[in-house]
């Protein structure tokens, strides 16, 4: 198990959701060791959080942080999960790893209760670190971590993420870009070049 990945700080997700809560009960899909759920609870954004995590060791760690954890692949957990209990479903850097993220978004939509919110974050393949090597050198190289992580099966831009989510029945309510602080100091490049400077894109949708 990559301990760094499974225990990573998710303050970025907390910051995005801070102005959209509070929520009663969240479901964190791909919850890793449960750190995000713990952070959301401590920040007062959710009252409680459940998780789905396929990796046994990570699921065991998450069980100590979350109310309930299913050690299952998402496809196997679909029928076991009490979807109507959740007013927030989280897919934080998960879609890019799934074989069929489109069907996953549809399955969750069909099972979620009316008014439930879906939070999605994905790496932004429009980032300059990907675009410039591709444009000027024809390079599209996979690496061990980051936007071009070799475990990523799919790639999204802010615009394609929105279209993907909306096409599966969700109504997008909020969007944001994760831009490094050094770029946020200047209004002009931040506003004009945001899609090229953001390492991640965030989205909140409603059923």
Q: Where are these predicted regions, by residue range?
A:
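Substrate-binding/catalytic lobe of Class I Rossmann-like enzymes that use SAM or dcSAM, i.e.
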Residues: 162-170
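A short beta-strand submotif of the Rossmann-like class I SAM-dependent methyltransferase core
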Residues: 88-94
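Acceptor-substrate binding/catalytic loop of class I
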Residues: 143-160
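Conserved N-terminal segment of class I S-adenosyl-L-methionine
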Residues: 1-84, 88, 102-105, 122, ...
């Amino acid at each position: 198990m990559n301990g760094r990945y499974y225990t990573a700080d998710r303050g970025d997700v907390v910051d995005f959701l801070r102005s959209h809560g509070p929520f009663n009960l969240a479901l964190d899909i791909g919850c890793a060791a449960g750190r995000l759920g713990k952070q959301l609870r401590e920040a007062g954004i959710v009252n409680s959080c459940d998780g789905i995590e396929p990796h046994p060791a990570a699921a065991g760690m998450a069980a100590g942080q979350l109310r309930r954890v299913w050690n299952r692949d998402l496809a196997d957990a679909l029928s076991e999960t009490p979807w109507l209990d959740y007013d927030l479903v989280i897919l934080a850097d998960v879609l890019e790893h799934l074989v069929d993220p489109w069907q996953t978004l549809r399955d969750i939509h069909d099972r979620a209760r009316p008014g439930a919110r879906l939070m999605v974050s994905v790496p932004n393949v429009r980032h300059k670190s990907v675009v410039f090597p591709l444009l000027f050198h024809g390079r599209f190289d996979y690496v061990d971590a980051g936007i071009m992580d070799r475990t990523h099966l799919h790639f999204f831009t802010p615009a394609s993420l929105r279209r993907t989510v909306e096409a599966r029945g969700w109504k997008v309510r909020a969007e944001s870009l994760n831009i490094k602080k050094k770029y946020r100091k200047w209004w002009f490049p931040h506003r004009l070049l945001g899609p090229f400077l953001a390492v991640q894109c965030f989205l909140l949708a409603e059923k």
